[in-house]
Swiss-Prot record:
Catalytic activity: a 2'-deoxyribonucleoside 5'-phosphate + H2O = a 2'-deoxyribonucleoside + phosphate
Official protein name in the record: 5'-deoxynucleotidase YfbR
SMART domains in the record: HDc
Quaternary structure annotation from Swiss-Prot or TrEMBL: Homodimer.
Pfam families: YfbR-like (PF12917)
Source organism phylogeny: Bacteria, Pseudomonadati, Pseudomonadota, Gammaproteobacteria, Enterobacterales
GO cellular component terms, semicolon-separated: cytoplasm
Binding site for substrate: 18-19, 33, 69, 77-80, 137
Main location: cytoplasm
EC number annotated for this UniProt entry: 3.1.3.89
Transmembrane segments: none
Organism name: Escherichia coli O139:H28 (strain E24377A / ETEC)
GO molecular function: 5'-deoxynucleotidase activity; metal ion binding; nucleotide binding
NCBIfam families the record matches: PRK03826.1
Gene from which the chain derives: yfbR
Annotated site (Appears to be important in orienting the phosphate for catalysis): 18
Length: 199
Protein backbone atom coordinates (compact mmCIF):
# COMPACT_ATOMS: atom_id res chain seq x y z
CA UNK A 1 0.00 0.00 0.00
CA UNK A 2 1.16 3.50 -0.81
CA UNK A 3 1.94 5.75 2.15
CA UNK A 4 0.03 8.99 2.70
CA UNK A 5 1.36 12.13 4.37
CA UNK A 6 -2.16 13.50 4.96
CA UNK A 7 -2.41 13.05 8.74
CA UNK A 8 1.27 13.84 9.28
CA UNK A 9 0.55 17.22 7.68
CA UNK A 10 -2.65 17.76 9.71
CA UNK A 11 -0.81 16.99 12.94
CA UNK A 12 1.35 20.05 12.24
CA UNK A 13 -1.64 22.38 12.62
CA UNK A 14 -0.64 22.52 16.29
CA UNK A 15 2.59 24.23 15.24
CA UNK A 16 0.79 27.16 13.56
CA UNK A 17 -0.04 29.91 16.02
CA UNK A 18 -3.03 32.16 15.49
CA UNK A 19 -2.98 35.94 16.10
CA UNK A 20 0.73 36.08 15.16
CA UNK A 21 1.04 39.88 15.15
CA UNK A 22 -0.55 40.33 18.58
CA UNK A 23 0.75 39.79 22.09
CA UNK A 24 -1.11 36.84 23.60
CA UNK A 25 -1.48 35.92 27.26
CA UNK A 26 -2.15 32.37 26.08
CA UNK A 27 -1.00 31.34 22.61
CA UNK A 28 -3.65 29.59 20.52
CA UNK A 29 -2.76 27.23 17.68
CA UNK A 30 -4.85 26.24 14.67
CA UNK A 31 -5.45 22.72 16.00
CA UNK A 32 -6.94 24.03 19.26
CA UNK A 33 -8.99 26.60 17.39
CA UNK A 34 -10.36 23.96 15.01
CA UNK A 35 -11.59 21.81 17.90
CA UNK A 36 -13.35 24.75 19.53
CA UNK A 37 -14.93 25.79 16.21
CA UNK A 38 -16.14 22.20 15.72
CA UNK A 39 -17.78 22.18 19.16
CA UNK A 40 -19.41 25.58 18.69
CA UNK A 41 -20.55 24.82 15.13
CA UNK A 42 -22.11 21.57 16.34
CA UNK A 43 -23.89 23.50 19.09
CA UNK A 44 -25.18 26.13 16.64
CA UNK A 45 -26.52 23.40 14.35
CA UNK A 46 -28.16 21.58 17.27
CA UNK A 47 -29.72 24.83 18.52
CA UNK A 48 -30.96 25.64 15.01
CA UNK A 49 -32.59 22.20 14.74
CA UNK A 50 -34.06 22.00 18.25
CA UNK A 51 -35.15 25.59 18.82
CA UNK A 52 -35.69 27.18 15.41
CA UNK A 53 -37.03 24.49 13.08
CA UNK A 54 -33.76 23.78 11.30
CA UNK A 55 -32.93 20.55 9.52
CA UNK A 56 -29.14 20.42 9.27
CA UNK A 57 -26.78 17.53 9.96
CA UNK A 58 -25.09 18.74 13.16
CA UNK A 59 -22.46 15.99 13.03
CA UNK A 60 -21.47 16.94 9.46
CA UNK A 61 -21.29 20.60 10.52
CA UNK A 62 -18.89 19.59 13.32
CA UNK A 63 -16.70 17.71 10.83
CA UNK A 64 -16.66 20.61 8.37
CA UNK A 65 -15.64 22.94 11.19
CA UNK A 66 -12.93 20.53 12.32
CA UNK A 67 -11.34 20.70 8.86
CA UNK A 68 -12.20 24.33 8.02
CA UNK A 69 -8.64 25.63 8.47
CA UNK A 70 -6.83 22.44 7.38
CA UNK A 71 -5.30 24.16 4.34
CA UNK A 72 -3.40 26.49 6.68
CA UNK A 73 -0.95 23.64 7.28
CA UNK A 74 0.28 24.44 3.75
CA UNK A 75 -0.40 28.20 3.59
CA UNK A 76 0.19 29.27 7.18
CA UNK A 77 -2.22 31.54 9.07
CA UNK A 78 -2.13 34.87 7.27
CA UNK A 79 -2.96 37.75 9.65
CA UNK A 80 -6.44 39.18 9.00
CA UNK A 81 -5.22 42.76 8.27
CA UNK A 82 -2.99 41.34 5.52
CA UNK A 83 -5.54 38.84 4.19
CA UNK A 84 -8.20 41.53 3.74
CA UNK A 85 -5.93 44.51 2.99
CA UNK A 86 -7.70 44.89 -0.34
CA UNK A 87 -10.02 42.85 -2.55
CA UNK A 88 -7.20 41.73 -4.86
CA UNK A 89 -5.18 40.19 -2.00
CA UNK A 90 -8.33 38.58 -0.55
CA UNK A 91 -9.16 37.08 -3.95
CA UNK A 92 -5.62 35.79 -4.52
CA UNK A 93 -5.51 34.27 -1.03
CA UNK A 94 -8.80 32.47 -1.73
CA UNK A 95 -7.19 31.00 -4.86
CA UNK A 96 -4.15 29.89 -2.84
CA UNK A 97 -6.45 28.29 -0.24
CA UNK A 98 -8.26 26.39 -3.00
CA UNK A 99 -4.95 25.04 -4.34
CA UNK A 100 -3.87 24.03 -0.82
CA UNK A 101 -7.21 22.31 -0.18
CA UNK A 102 -6.83 20.33 -3.41
CA UNK A 103 -3.25 19.41 -2.50
CA UNK A 104 -4.47 18.01 0.83
CA UNK A 105 -7.26 16.07 -0.88
CA UNK A 106 -4.71 14.62 -3.31
CA UNK A 107 -2.71 13.27 -0.34
CA UNK A 108 -5.63 11.08 0.76
CA UNK A 109 -5.55 7.50 -0.60
CA UNK A 110 -7.80 7.28 -3.64
CA UNK A 111 -10.18 4.79 -2.02
CA UNK A 112 -10.88 7.29 0.81
CA UNK A 113 -10.80 10.52 -1.19
CA UNK A 114 -14.57 10.78 -1.67
CA UNK A 115 -14.96 10.79 2.14
CA UNK A 116 -12.43 13.52 2.89
CA UNK A 117 -12.73 15.78 -0.18
CA UNK A 118 -16.17 17.18 0.82
CA UNK A 119 -14.79 18.01 4.29
CA UNK A 120 -11.68 19.84 3.08
CA UNK A 121 -12.97 21.55 -0.07
CA UNK A 122 -15.18 24.40 1.13
CA UNK A 123 -16.80 24.55 -2.32
CA UNK A 124 -18.56 21.29 -1.36
CA UNK A 125 -20.30 23.01 1.59
CA UNK A 126 -23.90 24.10 1.17
CA UNK A 127 -24.62 27.78 1.85
CA UNK A 128 -26.25 26.84 5.16
CA UNK A 129 -23.28 24.71 6.22
CA UNK A 130 -20.84 27.46 5.25
CA UNK A 131 -22.85 30.01 7.22
CA UNK A 132 -22.86 27.90 10.40
CA UNK A 133 -19.11 27.22 10.21
CA UNK A 134 -18.38 30.92 9.59
CA UNK A 135 -20.60 31.89 12.54
CA UNK A 136 -18.75 29.44 14.78
CA UNK A 137 -15.35 30.61 13.51
CA UNK A 138 -16.19 34.24 14.30
CA UNK A 139 -17.69 33.30 17.67
CA UNK A 140 -14.52 31.45 18.67
CA UNK A 141 -12.33 34.39 17.66
CA UNK A 142 -14.63 36.62 19.73
CA UNK A 143 -14.32 34.26 22.72
CA UNK A 144 -10.54 34.40 22.39
CA UNK A 145 -10.77 38.20 22.62
CA UNK A 146 -12.91 37.94 25.76
CA UNK A 147 -10.38 35.58 27.37
CA UNK A 148 -7.44 37.84 26.53
CA UNK A 149 -9.26 40.95 27.77
CA UNK A 150 -10.27 39.17 30.99
CA UNK A 151 -6.57 38.45 31.53
CA UNK A 152 -5.82 42.18 31.22
CA UNK A 153 -4.52 42.11 27.64
CA UNK A 154 -5.89 45.25 25.99
CA UNK A 155 -4.17 44.28 22.73
CA UNK A 156 -7.45 42.53 21.84
CA UNK A 157 -9.79 45.52 22.35
CA UNK A 158 -9.92 46.53 18.69
CA UNK A 159 -10.17 42.90 17.54
CA UNK A 160 -13.17 42.45 19.84
CA UNK A 161 -14.88 45.52 18.34
CA UNK A 162 -14.16 44.28 14.80
CA UNK A 163 -15.50 40.82 15.64
CA UNK A 164 -18.66 42.27 17.18
CA UNK A 165 -19.34 43.85 13.78
CA UNK A 166 -18.62 40.51 12.07
CA UNK A 167 -20.98 38.69 14.43
CA UNK A 168 -23.68 41.27 13.77
CA UNK A 169 -23.26 40.75 10.02
CA UNK A 170 -23.56 36.96 10.45
CA UNK A 171 -26.28 37.14 13.07
CA UNK A 172 -28.82 34.32 13.35
CA UNK A 173 -31.32 33.03 15.89
CA UNK A 174 -29.00 30.20 16.89
CA UNK A 175 -26.13 32.65 17.38
CA UNK A 176 -28.32 34.91 19.53
CA UNK A 177 -29.22 31.88 21.67
CA UNK A 178 -25.55 30.88 22.02
CA UNK A 179 -24.54 34.45 22.90
CA UNK A 180 -27.25 34.70 25.56
CA UNK A 181 -26.87 31.25 27.12
CA UNK A 182 -23.18 30.36 26.83
CA UNK A 183 -21.05 33.46 26.25
CA UNK A 184 -21.62 35.28 29.60
CA UNK A 185 -19.71 32.51 31.41
CA UNK A 186 -16.56 33.50 29.53
CA UNK A 187 -16.49 36.68 31.64
CA UNK A 188 -16.29 34.63 34.86
CA UNK A 189 -13.45 33.01 36.78
CA UNK A 190 -13.06 29.25 37.29
CA UNK A 191 -14.41 29.58 40.84
CA UNK A 192 -17.47 31.44 39.57
CA UNK A 193 -18.33 28.90 36.88
CA UNK A 194 -17.75 26.02 39.31
CA UNK A 195 -20.13 27.24 42.06
CA UNK A 196 -23.27 25.80 40.49
CA UNK A 197 -21.80 22.37 39.85
CA UNK A 198 -19.63 21.16 42.75
CA UNK A 199 -18.02 17.74 42.31
Amino acid sequence: MKQSHFFAHLSRLKLINRWPLMRNVLTENVSEHSLQVAMVAHALAAIKNRKFGGNVNAERIALLAMYHDASEVLTGDLPTPVKYFNSQIAQEYKAIEKIAQQKLVDMVPEELRDIFAPLIDEHAYSDEEKSLVKQADALCAYLKCLEELAAGNNEFLLAKTRLEATLEARRSQEMDYFMEVFVPSFHLSLDEISQDSPL
